[in-house]
Amino acid sequence: MTVHNPLVKRQQGSVVVPKSTVRPTTNGTTLKTRVASTNTLLYMPAGWKPSEVSPPDPAEAPPYSGYAYETPASIACIYSLVATATGCNPNTVTNNPTGGAKTIAIVDAYDDPWAGPDLAYFSAQFGLPFSTEKFQVVYQSGTEPPIDETGGWELEESLDIEYAHAMAPNATIYLVEANSNYFSDLLASVQIASNLIQCGRTTTCPTGSTGKGEVSMSWGGGEFSSETSYDSYFTTPGVVYFAAAGDSAGTIWPCVSPNVVCAGGTTLRRSPATGNFIAEWSWDEGGGGVSLYEGIPSYQSAIKSIVGTARGVPDVSSD
């Protein structure tokens, strides 16, 4: 259950918005000129300075006493992916998820040259299995895309692959890197991701291909009048498409597509004294609402009194 308690004081600190997350004030009118943004915000505790904090040595197995920050094990405990423990305390729980049997294809823009090493380091840090045979970077055009000079897309890519792996450590993960953050490149990469899941190759799959899995899209842009023309990108049989709802008010595409599971965000609140779980809150910065152009899908008929005749999002939310 998602809870917001206005009587509880917000944790003090500041939020840093990467340049890749800032939406343009005006956007293009075609897929080749319209850009997508990441959905990443960085929380900095009050008084925090980079020189004051160093991560634990990967050789030290979690949990890390006194940190009280979420780990794969603590999040798995909250969502009952493992045997639960009282408080699901990050300082004490150690059971990581063990699921994942199929394929997850993550689509992002630009190259993250440290994606593989970052994932290996992350896995060692939190006691997760890691195999190079189950992680592959795929380039949209077959050649390495440029990097994002702001570093924002690299951050998004590392976060995406790490927590996909954390929650489904036995799944095969593809990171599909688009040439740019133009929608034309991102949607071409979505098609590649769909093919990789359905038949294990980047080109069109043979008739009768039966592969199954998920495509993750942690990006989006403001809605536009012709967006419904492109919802067919998310209809490959056996593939479930997920997209982020965003980190600011309102709706974004492709999250509002009726062919996509729109994922919102929450925050897990913990006792400052013990680290035990208190409640799950919705974000006041989280995206959501009713679409400007997408009609209500049949599967939302039960909430028509809330969304009216339009597609409502998000569908699910989690930390």
Region locations from a protein language model:
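N-terminal zymogen propeptides
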Residues: 1-179, 199-210, 214, 240
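Extracellular protease catalytic domains of secreted zymogens
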Residues: 167, 171-319
